[in-house]
Each structure stands twice: as C-alpha cells, then as structure tokens.
Amino acid sequence: MFLMTSTPLLLVIGLVREGLALASEYNFGGFEADPACTKDDKIYLVSMYAHFDRGTIDAIFSAFSDCKDEREAVEHYLKSRVIGPYNDYLSKFKVKIGFDAKDYDVNELVPTKRFDSSCELVEPVGTRTSAVHNHLLNTYKDRKIGIHLFLWSCPTHNENIMDKIVIGEPKECARSIGVLWRGTEETIDFIKSGISEAISGAKDLFLNQGFPSPRDEDKLSYVCQHVDTCIASKPSVNGAIIFGIDETSDDAISTHIDVDTHPSDVYIPPQRGARAQRVIYVNEPSDSVDDECKY
C-alpha cells in the first residue's frame, strides 16, 4: 500500500483548496449563488437625498436645456444617467435606490454656510461634505438624516482635490457622499462608486467604466447588512420595504414613501410649490408635461 508523507499530503490539500477557491470565484461549475438580500417577494428601497452646488446646477441645466427648470434637469440627469442604470445592476440584490432632489440646491439646505469657490484655500470635496454632514447631524437631534449625495464644482481640477468621499457614522445609518463634478459623463462612475461605498463599504467600484468583477461584487453584497440594519417595514428617512415586487420586472416601482409619517426630529425634504413630497423612482411618470429633456 502506498503511503503519502505529511509534506506532499499538505501540498495536495493546499492545491485542492486553491482550486475550490478559483472555481468559486470564476464559477467554473456553472453554479451561481443567489446574491439577493431576501428570498421574500419584496425589495429594499434605499432613500438618497441629492444636493448640488450652483456650478453643478448650472452645468446640468445647460446640458439638459429642454428641461423646464433646474430641478427637472437635475432629476432627469440622476434618473436617466445614474440611478436607472445603477438600479438595473443592483436589482440582483433585491435592493434599489430611490432619490429625492426636492432640496437640490445645497445653498438653500445650509444657507449659513459659505464655501471657498476658488477651491484653493482648502481641499473642497472633503471639507464641504464634512461641514454639511455635521450640520445635518447637529440639526436633527436623533441624527436620523439618511444618505445624502453632494455634487461639488470647482473652476479648476488638480491632484490635490479628491474625486469623492463617503462620510459615515459608526453603528448608524447616516451617510454623506461628496463627489467632484467632472461633467455629465465622467461624473457618473464616481457617483455610482460613492453610493456603493455608502451602502456596502466597498471602495472604488465602478471606476473602470464597467461592472465590478466577481470578487468586487462579493464586496458589494455587504449591502444586505446595510438594508437589514437600516431599512424597516415602516417607511423612514432611510427608505422602505416594498412588497409584492418582482425584482426581474422592468415595471416601475410606483409606491410613494409617505414622509409625513416621519418624526419631526429626522430629515424631511421641504415642500416646494404644488408638488407633493415623494421620492423619485426610476421610470416613474414625471410631474412635467414634457418629460423628454434632451441632451
């Protein structure tokens, strides 16, 4: 009988383990684990509140000049260029992003804050995002502010200006994403990357203008921990659980979150004009008669 010594045996065991790891990573066996965060007939809707500085607002409104006003332009940009494609990818986790841009002008969100428009005195993206994040935390006593996206513009770009930053609170659901505006196309991947980091902790995904690799996608699966912790059955500033939705369907999620049920100590976007408070959903009919903002 052939006896294998301990050293070759350990070598074989190591090779087998390495082979199994490779097979799992590259799906050699054709088996693909379901990444969904739930097996139930429901989707986790993560609310995100979007804000832009004046330079970014002007740039987007100029690029989408057929939109009737600034708010419609920024909503159209996020809806068609960023959140729509991102949700198509995120749907495998049974998670979607619903964005709210009613409070789109950051100068109205924090009217007392004045930032260095030259972007030369201090690093702008981190400094501005941190300042507004702390302002929101200090304004709402229970620190329930949800996830906020801030797009910042600068007259010039240099290596000392960071492309994005994500600020979070330990063991809390509050997040602030700061992104440097680089134009309607180049900024998209940085926004997707910032959202991914805010909801999963995975850094620098989507920055290669493509989808994450299988290994990186596994990092994004930590979104399940975020929604399990932050999204409850009752709608809140963090989002809501939408029941009876087929994750493979292209139909719009039309259920509105009733933010009027939120406690007064959480962030609630202001009512503006005749529009009801709501979250914008991908493919949801617009309030505008002309929804085709041309680029």
Swiss-Prot record:
Main location: other
One biological process term in Gene Ontology: sporulation resulting in formation of a cellular spore
Subcellular location, record wording: Spore wall
UniProt keyword list: Signal, Sporulation
GO cellular component, one term: spore wall
Signal peptide feature range: 1-23
Protein family: Belongs to the SWP7 family.
Name assigned to this protein: Spore wall protein 7
Gene behind the chain: SWP7
